[in-house]
Structure formats: C-alpha cells, structure tokens
C-alpha cells in the first residue's frame, strides 16, 4: 500500500516538473521490500505549449509619478504649493486642535460617575452624624415616618 502511494506521488512529482519546464532526472527506482518499480511516466517528456499571442505593452498609460515632478510630495495634491498647504492644514488640525483641545476637554470633564462627589457627601454626612450623636450608619436608608404606604383592603 505504502509503496503504491510512493509510486503515485513520484509520478506526480515528475509530471509537475516536466510541465513547468524543469529538468527532470529519468530515474528508475526499485524497492527491496515490495518489488515496486518507480519509473518516469510518459508525461515527463512533454513541454508546455508556447504562447500563440505575442506580448504587447499596456495600451493605457500608467499614472504619472508625482515624485518625479515634486520629490517633496506629501500625497495631498498634484500642485506642489497646494500639497504643502494641505499637509500643513492636516497637521495643524490633527495635532493642535485635536490633541491639545481634545486633551483639555477630557481633563475638564465633569466628575466621572460622580465618584468625587459621593466621597465628599459621605464625609460630610459622617461629620454631621458624629456632631449630633447619631449612629454613623442606619438600617433604614429612608425615614420610615415619611414613607406613605397604601391602605390594606
């Protein structure tokens, strides 16, 4: 079984080398184990057909290279003056406006999730309760006397 698969893969390898125009060595191999003989196939002598149509230049002109005209091109415009101005505008708005003003905006945002306010409020409430002799924490979050319940029917 294994020798048969090896013979098949050897034939495929020789055929692939022949179709690509690679020189294939004509080899005859005999296995001492199963008496299998591997020889090059008839496909090994065939060459790929030559192209019938001659190669032609591309009739469409290629894009002009902006770097031949303007070696300092930044890729924004064909005109060198507009190219430099567009580059300056992009970098001005990209760096100055977005980075500087954006970071200033983030720095002055209000308290995120009100963490600072809740801490200050808790400290104020603890001071008030200690000053008036009340317990620091109660089991009731709301004053039970102010809660109005519906009447039982």
UniProtKB/Swiss-Prot annotation:
It is found in: Mitochondrion inner membrane. Keywords: Cardiomyopathy, Disease variant, Electron transport, Membrane, Mitochondrion, Mitochondrion inner membrane, Primary mitochondrial disease, Respiratory chain, Transit peptide, Transmembrane, Transmembrane helix, Transport. InterPro entries: NADH_UbQ_OxRdtase_ESSS_su. One of its GO terms (biological process) is proton motive force-driven mitochondrial ATP synthesis. Belongs to the complex I NDUFB11 subunit family. Complex I is composed of 45 different subunits. Interacts with BCAP31. It is linked to Linear skin defects with multiple congenital anomalies 3: A disorder characterized by dermal, ocular, neurological and cardiac abnormalities. LSDMCA3 clinical features include linear skin defects on face and neck at birth, lacrimal duct atresia, myopia, nystagmus, strabismus, cardiomyopathy, axial hypotonia, seizures, corpus callosum agenesis, and dilation of lateral ventricles. Mitochondrial complex I deficiency, nuclear type 30: A form of mitochondrial complex I deficiency, the most common biochemical signature of mitochondrial disorders, a group of highly heterogeneous conditions characterized by defective oxidative phosphorylation, which collectively affects 1 in 5-10000 live births. Clinical disorders have variable severity, ranging from lethal neonatal disease to adult-onset neurodegenerative disorders. This is NADH dehydrogenase [ubiquinone] 1 beta subcomplex subunit 11, mitochondrial.
């Amino acid at each position: 079984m294994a020798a048969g698969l090896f013979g098949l893969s050897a034939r495929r390898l020789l055929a692939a080398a022949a179709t690509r125009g690679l020189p294939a060595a004509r080899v005859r191999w005999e296995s001492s184990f199963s008496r299998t003989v591997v020889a090059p196939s008839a496909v090994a002598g065939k060459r790929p057909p030559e192209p019938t149509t001659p190669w032609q230049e591309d009739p469409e002109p290629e894009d002009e290279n902006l770097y031949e005209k303007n070696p300092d091109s930044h890729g924004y415009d064909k005109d060198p003056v507009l190219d430099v101005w567009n580059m300056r505008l992009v970098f001005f708005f990209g760096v100055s406006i977005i980075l500087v003003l954006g970071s200033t905006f983030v720095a002055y945002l209000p308290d995120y999730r009100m963490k600072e306010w809740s801490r200050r409020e808790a400290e104020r409430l603890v001071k008030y309760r200690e000053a008036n002799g009340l317990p620091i924490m109660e089991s009731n979050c709301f004053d039970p006397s102010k809660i109005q319940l519906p009447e039982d029917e």
